[in-house]
């Protein structure tokens, strides 16, 4: 078995060794809940990696959005190049859930666009858990949604070994059962093709490698892994496991039992609706469910099969769905990153799902078993946990209340101090802000300004622009790519001041920022709570010359606690710096490194000029498609999904153009 091994040119320093030892010891002592309190820039991810190396447990890292999960996944892949580091997030690029609006008698059918690359990564994650122990999966809250039965998934796995006596047609039949499709022309993920005694299988967890099984009579003669694009053999295999092409794949026997259960539930529910004088609803439910049953009998699945997942799994009514957590061995470790944001997200998921299902069940669009295709409730989530480490600079009440051990990581290896906090009166705050901005710009740094309302942010942006200050406003309507472009431009000095309401989201740890100002800091509320203030102050913690100005006429409890906590952290870091002779120095990261997503728009222009590209390839459209396919796969492997998706669209256009020419 492969062991977790951190590969890094750095060794743990500052508070890291103490935190690693404390948390690892707690895990060995079977502590269920622990908290790692780590300030911005203290190297929490590196600490997490070292804890994983120490305890050697399969690990799930839970992040609160896809972007943060992708960042963490990239970092863990750097630390663990020889171990399986996987990415598991929602595979929907676009998702419109099924719903019924009774007031207007409007039925909204489920509409979704599935990202094929993310689906591949999800399959890669689940199959890795069955194949090895040294697995780290970085996931979003998508991991608390129903995923199909892991026991059934494992049972349906096809195991092929060199020299094994196996009928080719029997394997083909099994492949169809686990939802692989035969396609001798378009050989893609989740398909297989047959030519004489040769069976090629394109696993659901792969994007560029397929498996060739060669038969001699009823015996498997050879198994090879080959490159789908070139056809070249990569390696010869003694054994291969082919995992199902869908997490909801079900054996024929189980499906027959499930169909009987669905028919019984349908009969019961129809009687119930008729007794309530809901004749239309009863007829609708009968028609829709019978169609689904027919599809399941014919092809093994139907659209919206997840709504029958409880019946397919053979679970009792009201029992929790099987999720990614059930695919892990019992002795797994869970890190909840930015737990103060992630845990409330987990808590909120189930309520929204239930309210939508109520009308679907009531008006005869779905059977009541659809209720059990849902995210876990928070209580169910807790019950599935083994050992948890909450990671946050500002852990909430839940984390601190339940944790039996807390490790603090205040010292930054760079020696950087938490910024100095200055409180100034509200009267004349705009004039004072303008003066402070000018001083900071003269020193060559940038400024973040956080306001309480959208109106104030817009007015302040207009005012500063009128005063000749290069200013931009960051608001919630801006999409991810545009948002990242704004931060990229701020770092490059295209403008100097960024105004916003909530500047706490990831990606705003900008070393060039030397001034963070908080307007109306004394207005208690969500945006001026202790957690929000500490997080906002942290935005200035990447620069050795930074400071924070809070504008307020009174010092609220939240302000007082924030100032006290920041001063405590400054004192600890100053003592450490003095003891070790460290002079705090701003670490200026390469701009491309922090914000890879921002150049996608530029890269798109390059790919959109197809006429120029074709000229450079002597109008050989096939060669250009081949080049773009390689680049698309490389982008996807590097988690650059926007670039990969755009390349996919360009390839599709080229293929269409080729067909037109023919």
Swiss-Prot record:
GO cellular component, one term: cytoplasm
Domain Helicase ATP-binding: 25-182
Record-level Gene Ontology MF annotations: ATP binding; ATP hydrolysis activity; DNA binding; excinuclease ABC activity; helicase activity
Domain Helicase C-terminal: 429-595
Coiled-coil stretches noted in the UniProt entry, renumbered to this chain: none
Pfam families: Helicase_C (PF00271), ResIII (PF04851), UVR (PF02151), UvrB (PF12344), UvrB_inter (PF17757)
Residues the record lists as binding ATP: 38-45
Quaternary structure and interacting proteins, as annotated: Forms a heterotetramer with UvrA during the search for lesions. Interacts with UvrC in an incision complex.
Function: The UvrABC repair system catalyzes the recognition and processing of DNA lesions. A damage recognition complex composed of 2 UvrA and 2 UvrB subunits scans DNA for abnormalities. Upon binding of the UvrA(2)B(2) complex to a putative damaged site, the DNA wraps around one UvrB monomer. DNA wrap is dependent on ATP binding by UvrB and probably causes local melting of the DNA helix, facilitating insertion of UvrB beta-hairpin between the DNA strands. Then UvrB probes one DNA strand for the presence of a lesion.
Domain remarks: The beta-hairpin motif is involved in DNA binding.
Name of the protein in its database record: UvrABC system protein B
